[in-house]
Regions:
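Extracytoplasmic gate region of multi-pass secondary transporters
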Residues: 194-260, 311, 315, 345-349
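C-terminal transmembrane helical hairpin of 12-TM major facilitator-type secondary transporters
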Residues: 265-317
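Helix-to-loop junctions at the C-terminal end of transmembrane segments
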Residues: 25-37, 122, 254-268, 353-354
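Cytoplasmic membrane-interface "Motif A"-like loop-to-helix N-cap segments
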Residues: 34-46, 264-277
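Conserved MFS/SLC helix-loop-helix module at the cytosolic interface between two early adjacent transmembrane helices
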Residues: 23-63
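Helix-breaking motifs and short loop linkers at transmembrane-helix boundaries and internal kinks
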Residues: 5, 37, 58-64, 75, ...
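Glycine-rich segments within core transmembrane alpha-helices of 12-TM secondary carriers
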Residues: 97-129, 141-144, 335-345
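Central mid-sequence intracellular linker of multi-pass
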Residues: 93, 103-105, 128-195
Length: 356
């Protein structure tokens, strides 16, 4: 912020503008996934994502950051809903709680590793010409491009194209997935997969509204919590903040797979999604209202565990409750509501930080 003269209002705009392009490209990206297949589409997303991240190294002013955020929204728009849909095409419904949880576990692992690493890079990799934050984006962006290239060569589009499965295994898996799709279709008489027909489903609208609210809180925390944590003590360095921010995600690394497994074992999704949301809300209130440092840290842990543990059970709901014919569009629509929530909450918090 100091390097480029970014004000709190600029920061709010930078945080929010991402969600505009993220929102706009949700549905087109899901269509692209279906047209081109997972291997080509997801690898392209990852390569573009990494390239834009790395190019932030050369940013000269606020406008460059705003432009980068717009393009990050374009590329990121299709990744998460694409992966949720991709996993639903590979794993039976009874296993999707733990499968989604293990996929989301990457968020916790990345946060545990990235938070202290980012703080260290920003603090120690300063050169006369390039500040630490620039090196942070370069170090994160370049490996992502190479991972995208590997994805193109290694990711199969569907179980039928998996070289490591025998014909018998492929047949058994495809038959099981077909049975799950028939069960889900029986709950939804509307087989019209057009966009307008899909989004009129009241179940989809309920799922989308709930996701918008919880993701608004999560996305706001991603941008604003490090500053709040640094305000816990005047003695905290950037490295200290990174280490503290990794604590809740360490606990989440253990809670997420267990909670997803428990959801599968009980074959129950709704309460397994709702209870972690409640825990995250309690954590937020503790961070904001409790003066004790130890209780604030406990609240931070509640937030991290809750905000990540709900993912697995929640994302098992769309494939169980919505029509398979419109599932890709449904997942993209739900995720687009998170970007709307993120845009509104970041603009609101920017206003509050300036005037209050």
């Amino acid at each position: 912020n100091e390097s480029l003269g970014i004000t709190p209002e600029d920061f709010a705009n930078i945080s929010s503008i991402f969600f505009i392009s993220y929102l706009i490209f949700q549905i087109p990206s899901s269509i692209g996934l279906q047209k081109l297949g997972a291997r080509k589409w997801i690898s392209s997303i990852i390569i573009g994502w990494g390239a834009v991240t790395g190019l932030i190294f050369f940013a000269k002013d606020t406008q460059h950051i705003l432009l980068a955020r717009i393009f990050l929204g374009v590329f990121e728009a299709g990744f998460f809903p694409g992966m949720v849909y991709y996993l639903a095409c590979w794993f039976p419904a009874r296993e999707r709680g733990k499968v989604n949880s293990f996929f989301m576990l990457s968020i916790a692992v990345a946060s545990v590793l990235a938070a202290p690493m980012s703080g260290w890079i920003i603090e120690h990799l300063n050169t006369p010409d390039y500040e630490g934050w620039r090196w942070l984006f370069a170090i994160e962006g370049i490996p992502t491009v190479f991972l995208g290239i590997l994805t193109f060569y290694l990711l199969p589009d569907s179980p039928e194209k998996a070289k490591w499965l025998t014909p018998q295994q492929i047949s058994a898996l495809v038959n099981k997935l077909r049975t799950d799709n028939e069960t889900a279709a029986a709950l939804n008489k509307n087989t019209n997969s057009s966009f307008l027909s899909v989004i009129k489903n009241p179940v989809l609208l309920q799922l989308s509204f709930a996701y918008m609210l919880i993701q608004a809180a999560a996305l706001a925390a991603n941008y604003w919590l490090p500053g709040l944590v640094k305000g816990f003590s005047a003695d905290f360095t950037d490295t200290d903040v990174g280490l503290i921010m990794s604590i809740p995600f360490i606990f989440a690394m253990f809670s997420m797979p267990w909670w997803g497994w428990h959801s599968d074992k009980k074959n129950e999704r709704k309460w397994h999604a709702a209870l972690p949301m409640f825990l995250a809300g309690c954590g937020f209130l503790m961070i904001a209202l409790v003066p004790s440092m130890s209780l604030r840290m406990l609240g931070l842990t509640f937030y991290g565990v809750g905000i990540l543990s709900y993912y697995g059970p929640y994302w098992a709901l769309p494939s169980a409750l919505l029509s398979p014919s419109g599932l890709a569009i449904s997942i993209a629509f739900i995720n687009s509501c998170s970007s709307l929530g993120g845009f509104l909450i970041n603009k609101s918090l920017g206003f509050v930080s300036i005037h209050y």
